[in-house]
């Protein structure tokens, strides 16, 4: 069994990423982070909406909850499925918001902050929370096809990851 050695350069690099800088440095990172073009904002919204559609449609495809909704909304079995769907989407959406914020913090000082990816994740989480609330209080369902939602999510995420937003 070999021991894992942590080099000083690895720990100092991690400490440098996690440690906040001065107020002026962080203010500069923050102002660079929110300077997006209109087409970049479209990609962010695309990531968010297609992500929520993919999560909701995957859940619907696995459980068949849409068939039950068409039949009757007040059956106890349907009510349990909708409550489970609400809990799953709200948890995943909260994780997306937290993950997007953490990722934005970790990438804040880099030359390419992956703004489209982190803002898309955070916005997707926020829209997911709103979608979960509509399920909880109005019993709505999503009609977008499962395959289209996952393909569009993948396309927007890849677009957000690979597009250089630093203006170079």
Curated annotation (Swiss-Prot):
Any one of the GO CC terms: membrane
Keyword Membrane belongs to the record: yes
Residues glycosylated per entry: 74, 164
Record key words, sorted: Glycoprotein, Membrane, Transmembrane, Transmembrane helix
Keyword Lipoprotein included in the entry's annotation: no
Top-level taxon in the UniProt lineage: Viruses
Residue spans crossing the bilayer: 36-56, 86-106, 115-135, 143-163
Topology in the lipid bilayer: Multi-pass membrane protein
Annotated localization: Membrane
Full protein name: Uncharacterized protein R513
Source organism per UniProt: Acanthamoeba polyphaga mimivirus
């Amino acid at each position: 069994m070999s021991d894992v050695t942590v080099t000083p350069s690895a720990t100092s690099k991690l400490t440098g990423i996690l440690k906040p800088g001065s107020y002026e440095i962080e203010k500069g990172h923050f102002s660079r982070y929110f300077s997006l073009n209109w087409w970049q904002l479209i990609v962010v919204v695309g990531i968010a909406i297609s992500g929520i559609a993919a999560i909701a449609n995957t859940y619907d495809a696995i459980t068949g909850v849409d068939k039950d909704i068409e039949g009757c909304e007040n059956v106890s079995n349907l009510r349990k499925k909708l409550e489970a769907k609400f809990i799953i989407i709200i948890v995943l959406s909260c994780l997306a918001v937290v993950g997007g914020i953490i990722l934005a913090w970790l990438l804040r000082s880099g030359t390419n902050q992956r703004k489209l990816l982190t803002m898309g994740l955070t916005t997707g989480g926020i829209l997911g929370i709103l979608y979960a609330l509509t399920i909880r209080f109005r019993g709505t369902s999503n009609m977008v096809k499962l395959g289209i939602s996952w393909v569009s999510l993948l396309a927007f995420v890849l677009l957000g990851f690979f597009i250089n937003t630093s203006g170079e």
